[in-house]
């Protein structure tokens, strides 16, 4: 296994814009996300708090792209597992490069918390409906795919998806 290597990226961040969803000729959905991650620290010389934000280009495919387009909005917090990929193209004789995180069917996209506009409506629902949805998503995800990438896609029809995801995410922690 060490000869092949591991290419895995995990991000928890917030969307800078609404997802851009398009459909490729074979009918599959592709969504582009701009995800911001931030870290903060105290400057040793000045004592001031400092913050640095990194922007990540994330590309989702298939059902995950459709879910992102329907439920994610600017400011939403997401958990992403995917692969780092750099591609290049020629732009009038200049070679351009872009690095993206690809989330295919073996990857994961989970919505954390609720969208800012849905916050008041969705809050009471997780206690009643969150646990069963998480269990259903786990069962369905195992039946349809071998990976856990489909767990986030299963709750698509229910508007209370973000709350169900919170419980599903907590259940995945092994301790």
Curated annotation (Swiss-Prot):
Bias kind Basic residues: ranges: 141-151
Ranges annotated as DNA-binding: 55-61
PROSITE patterns, per the entry: SSB
InterPro entries: NA-bd_OB-fold (IPR012340), Primosome_PriB/ssb (IPR000424), ssDNA-bd (IPR011344)
Ranges where the SSB domain occurs: 6-110
Keywords per UniProt: DNA replication, DNA-binding, Plasmid
GO biological process: DNA replication
Composition bias, Acidic residues: 163-175
GO MF term list: single-stranded DNA binding
Subunit structure: Homotetramer.
Designated name of the protein: Plasmid-derived single-stranded DNA-binding protein
Region entry Disordered, spans: 114-175
Described function: May contribute to the conjugative processing of DNA. It has a functional relationship with Psi (plasmid-mediated sos inhibition) proteins.
A single Gene Ontology CC term: nucleoid
Organism, scientific name: Escherichia coli
Biased composition (Low complexity): 115-133
